């Protein structure tokens, strides 16, 4: 039995977000194929995701130096508890399903803030004399990525720092990232929206059966 963490990184409701619609198709098929697995849904835009800021970094250094957690300011304790809870939730999962849009050739800022909660030396990777070593080698992920243009291939593929960035950072910590599902090109061809979404949903069903 596997524990799946379904991470949604779009503020848009499902009826508006095409990638979220495709992700729901993926999850429905996955649950049908794996009824004994547990699925936990994390909607980032409905979640407190603390920024890795000076306050958190200072608290981390103070704790490493021996300061007691209870000696931190109450608001810092609260922020650190929220941060650590996201870390532990991520580490406890076996599989990850990320659904996220491409914004200005990158990922949503809240998704980047979330990434900072689990890419942590000593938890998801460690430094060695030979360089960084991944620690999450027994886990896997799939990325469901929406964009108005076409960036998965072709002349604009080198422009994007969305799907390639998230894929790279997950691989850096050892996670096996299977082929992504792209929901793309609708802004280029609005008349083909239904066709594009249907094709992506078909890929999602096939991918879910193998995930």
Swiss-Prot record:
<keyword id="KW-0520">NAD</keyword>
<comment type="similarity">
    <text>Belongs to the azoreductase type 1 family.</text>
</comment>
<feature type="binding site">
    <location>
        <position position="10"/>
    </location>
    <ligand>
        <name>FMN</name>
    </ligand>
</feature>
<dbReference type="GO" id="GO:0050446">
    <property type="term" value="F:azobenzene reductase activity"/>
</dbReference>
<keyword id="KW-0288">FMN</keyword>
<dbReference type="InterPro" id="IPR050104">
    <property type="entry name" value="FMN-dep_NADH:Q_OxRdtase_AzoR1"/>
</dbReference>
<dbReference type="Pfam" id="PF02525">
    <property type="entry name" value="Flavodoxin_2"/>
</dbReference>
<dbReference type="InterPro" id="IPR029039">
    <property type="entry name" value="Flavoprotein-like_sf"/>
</dbReference>
<comment type="function">
    <text>Quinone reductase that provides resistance to thiol-specific stress caused by electrophilic quinones.</text>
</comment>
<dbReference type="InterPro" id="IPR003680">
    <property type="entry name" value="Flavodoxin_fold"/>
</dbReference>
<dbReference type="GO" id="GO:0009055">
    <property type="term" value="F:electron transfer activity"/>
</dbReference>
<comment type="subunit">
    <text>Homodimer.</text>
</comment>
<feature type="binding site">
    <location>
        <begin position="17"/>
        <end position="19"/>
    </location>
    <ligand>
        <name>FMN</name>
    </ligand>
</feature>
<comment type="function">
    <text>Also exhibits azoreductase activity. Catalyzes the reductive cleavage of the azo bond in aromatic azo compounds to the corresponding amines.</text>
</comment>
<protein>
    <recommendedName>
        <fullName>FMN-dependent NADH:quinone oxidoreductase 2</fullName>
        <ecNumber>1.6.5.-</ecNumber>
        <ecNumber>1.7.1.17</ecNumber>
    </recommendedName>
</protein>
<dbReference type="GO" id="GO:0016655">
    <property type="term" value="F:oxidoreductase activity, acting on NAD(P)H, quinone or similar compound as acceptor"/>
</dbReference>
<dbReference type="GO" id="GO:0010181">
    <property type="term" value="F:FMN binding"/>
</dbReference>
<keyword id="KW-0285">Flavoprotein</keyword>
<dbReference type="InterPro" id="IPR023048">
    <property type="entry name" value="NADH:quinone_OxRdtase_FMN_depd"/>
</dbReference>
<keyword id="KW-0560">Oxidoreductase</keyword>
<dbReference type="GO" id="GO:0016652">
    <property type="term" value="F:oxidoreductase activity, acting on NAD(P)H as acceptor"/>
</dbReference>
């Amino acid at each position: 039995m596997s524990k799946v963490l379904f991470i949604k990184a779009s503020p848009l409701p499902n009826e508006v977000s095409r990638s979220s619609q495709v992700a729901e198709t993926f999850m429905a098929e996955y649950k049908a194929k794996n009824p004994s697995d547990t699925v936990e849904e994390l909607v980032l835009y409905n979640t407190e995701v603390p920024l890795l800021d000076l306050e958190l970094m200072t608290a981390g250094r103070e704790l490493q130096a021996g300061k007691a957690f209870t000696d931190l300011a109450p608001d810092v304790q609260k922020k650190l508890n929220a941060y650590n809870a996201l870390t532990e939730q991520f580490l406890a999962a076996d599989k990850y399903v990320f659904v996220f849009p491409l914004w200005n050739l990158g990922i949503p800022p809240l998704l980047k803030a979330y990434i900072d909660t689990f890419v942590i030396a000593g938890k998801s990777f460690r430094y060695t004399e030979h360089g960084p070593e991944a620690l999450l080698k027994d886990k896997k992920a799939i990325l469901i990525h929406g964009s108005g243009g076409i960036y998965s291939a072709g002349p604009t593929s080198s422009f994007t720092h969305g799907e390639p960035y998230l894929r790279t950072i997950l691989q850096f910590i050892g996670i096996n990232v299977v082929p992504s599902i792209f929901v793309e090109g609708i802004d280029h061809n609005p008349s083909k929206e239904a066709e594009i979404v249907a094709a992506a949903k078909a890929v999602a069903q096939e991918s879910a059966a193998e995930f």
